[in-house]
Amino acid sequence: MTRHTRTLLLSAAATCLMAGTAWAECKPVTMADMGGVAPGDFPQQYDLSAFEAAAGCEMTFSANPEIETLNAEIKGNPDLPPLEERLPEEPLVVVPYDAIGTYGGTLRAISNATEAGTSDFLSVRHVNLVRYADDLQTIVPNVAKSWEWNDDFTQLTFKLRKGHKWSDGAPFTSADVKFWYDNIALDSKVIEKPKGYALVADKPMTVDTPDDETVVFNLPSPKPGLLASFATVYAQPFLPKHFLGEYHPDLNADADTLAAECGFATGLEVISAYYGNSDWTDTPTPMLKNPDQVDCLPKSTYPTLESHIYTAETTEGRKLVANPYFFMVDPTGQQLPYISRQDETYANDNEVRILKLVNGEVDYKSQSLTLAAAPILLENQEKGNFTVQLAPTIAMPTFSFNVTSEDMAKRELFGNVEFRKAMSVAINRDELNETAFFGQGVPKQFIAFSPTPSFVDPETEKMYTEYDPDGAKAMLDGIGMVDTDGDGFRELPGGAKFVLNVQFATQGIGGEVVELVAQYWSDVGVQTTVKEVTPDEYRSAQSSNQLDVGAWEKGQPTAIIMGNKELFVPPFENYFAHRTGMLWAEWVDSNGASGVEPPEWVKTMMADADAFQGAMPGSDEQAAAGAKLAKATAENVLFIGTVQAPNVIYHRNAVKNFTEFKTQSYEYYRTFPYLPAQWFIQE
């Protein structure tokens, strides 16, 4: 008797008594036609027993006919057992939008480069403990089967799926979550500093594992937003202990000896080769980072729970195949994903990427596209047999100044709020909207929260946004920044020549936006130059405190801020996003031992962020703390907002079960709410 049959007997008996009907094969229901099947507890998905009860059926499982071939391409994977032994006892049943899919095909993606412009493609295979449903309001199970909070939001318990397996067939258990937290997320030998989502008011949690299917997060103080953080964050709170743990010296006394067999100095070097000393899930694998050692290693990449896994990686791109142990099925019992392969190619030139989209050489793209690309894509969508959606965004283009510049004269200037106010009102947002965004956007100040929550005074997002070049000039005059040599451009208050150098990457902001803003600043006498660089060059300069100006999109929904306070703590976001105040961050991280002490308003904002996260959702306390955060953000204009406008989502019409997105946004992790494991290719 199989595991499935054993669990089925109980549910079948109960349901047949209620319905008075015989069991049958499960019907091919879709969201477009549910065939009388009642909705489940969560939108578009059921646990197996719940679906069988609702549909009055007994599910028979089937797999991709290519799956053994695909499995053979995954280095280190053994031969496959039967499908029922590869699925958990309660697989997640996904109801497709429009049609039951067919297997096969290759999803073609394009990114800027390794770790650059990749998150839209990453999200296609992404999983986490939970996710947001496509309404972007409802948190639903994903890897976890269920969850439960205690009364004061200081303990969050997850139930995992019994029998769930990693992509190499090893059991996935609560130990893999604890390994991620204790031995990776909190281990400074692996990740230098714990990320904000892994802490509660800057203090660590503890993780208990009462049994293989139960994970308990114990919080030092309330953090109701922790669940939403899991639903949106790119990082995955589980790692294969059975594999990576072998190379961790805290878990295996022979870790360094094992690593030395393949030419690594320590076991931690092997973990770095696989995991990258980062929680970003597309850091280069050993196939790219350690080509001379990868043949010796047991696997080319560490096992995953995602829908697809890497099999090849070069500087030109990457290839993936379907995970033969993936935990989702469709209503007829077909194991997901439908699509057998994924190919990602790199093109850092924006014009090259657009041309490939126009020619139909890419199946899905949203990241690094700007509204400026919309006309040519819309003009060609019928001929090219693709669809372009203009969807609302959450983040908007923002600018910042290096308030801890190594150049002391610049540091003093950039740290002066009057300078930042002047540079904000120097921007003609209405013209910027018409020129760069075809009049489709809304001029706004950056307030961190997006969309604007009800607890924020609408006037807050208007602070220092009214175009006032004369006022900007007067403010610059007032801080002693005047033109002393008659060349039309202002010198520093001490009289030294000043040129504002703006470097930008099209992954983070449109070139047309940067060019216009630079012209507005030059128009009020601040000489500004512009240079496009690669995302890697931009991030490297930002990390080394070498940028004059930060230029990248920014903004997060309330649900994310409830779980991650990075927008209010120096450097005010992560490595892949928009940062400033790098030496403030060093001071915070070192508890004042090094770096530069931030001003009091920054320290107050950090405390208010803790208060916001610790308050009950919807409470007066939360509203008051949130309003203070938004006001402080706008008043101090550390980040200057511009225009919030819709942006482009592209997909080829051959990609089926592709629905309209509520937003074009990284903040809900792009495709993750829309279950791309249901996509299939039909030419």
Spans of model-derived segments:
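Proteolytic maturation boundary segments
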Residues: 36-37, 41, 70-81, 85-100, ...
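Middle-to-C-terminal accessory/interaction subdomains
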Residues: 624, 647-652
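N-terminal lobe/hinge region of extracytoplasmic solute-binding protein
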Residues: 67, 71-151, 182
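Surface-exposed binding/hinge segments that line
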Residues: 196-286, 661
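Glycine-rich and polybasic anion-binding loops at the starts of cofactor/ligand-binding domains
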Residues: 642
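Gram-negative bacterial Sec-dependent N-terminal signal peptides
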Residues: 1-23
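Extracytoplasmic/periplasmic ligand-capture domains
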Residues: 25-63, 72-73, 131-135, 148-149, ...
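A structural "hinge/loop" feature
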Residues: 2, 98-124, 143, 226-235, ...
